[in-house]
């Protein structure tokens, strides 16, 4: 990050967009904290950021369609700004068919990871900055719960507190056990 910032003569910027539940909002605070720790500066305008991250939701099909729509718009921005990085994470990335669709039809995306390995985010960013290929790191599940990640709180008066991760009831109508 430091080398690229020196080349550009300014700090690298990022913008995180959160789709979905309170756990995604909490995860986005962690993503923000990690990015700031490695030298990025938050940018309010998505189109101006060097790194755009979508923290996705997949509970409803409409949420998936929103992400695809936003990616179409972001592709046009990236064509004008080829050094821009695009990262996707969250529940939607835990679905194998979504990742296959992204690999095939959205090859301009730079980084894809799921809900179980946010603690590796800085490492994944470094891997992408060192290579010129799409980085995909999806874990089906994990027994690792890393709680001491840097976090940048969006509100001074409230905070998300994870009391559980996902659910293991596997109700026939629910996707949560498969993606969280």
PLM ranges: what are they?
Residues 1-180:
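Proteins enriched for Cys/Gly/acidic motifs involved in redox and nucleic-acid/cofactor modification
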